[in-house]
A protein has these predicted regions:
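Short alpha-helical DNA-recognition segment
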Residues: 22-40
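A short, Lys/Arg-rich alpha-helix, primarily the initiator
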Residues: 1-22
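DNA major-groove recognition helix of helix-turn-helix/homeodomain DNA-binding modules
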Residues: 49-66
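Residues within the helices of the helix-turn-helix
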Residues: 17, 26-28, 54, 65
Length: 77
């Protein structure tokens, strides 16, 4: 059994990148404020933890629930 759901990781990476770019933020700025290397997440080099996702959602001013809108049932499991 695979340990990673690559489609879900890609969706998450794309969603985080879109949120960052919509706010006009660089990867460096996000790292400075959160201590999370969002660049590694965006290119699929890092599996994001729930804690990191929560921190990033708070930083971007959205709830995890709003962040996850658009995930299909197939992507989520």
């Amino acid at each position: 059994r695979e340990r990673y759901d690559y489609e879900l990781l890609k969706w998450t990476a794309d969603r985080l990148k879109a949120l960052r770019e919509e706010r006009g933020l660089s990867q460096e700025t996000v790292y400075f404020h959160t201590n999370i290397n969002i660049g590694r997440i965006e290119i699929g080099k890092s599996n994001i933890s729930l804690t990191s996702l929560s921190i990033l959602c708070k930083y971007f001013g959205i709830s995890i629930e709003d962040f996850s809108k658009g995930i299909s049932t197939e992507q989520a499991g």
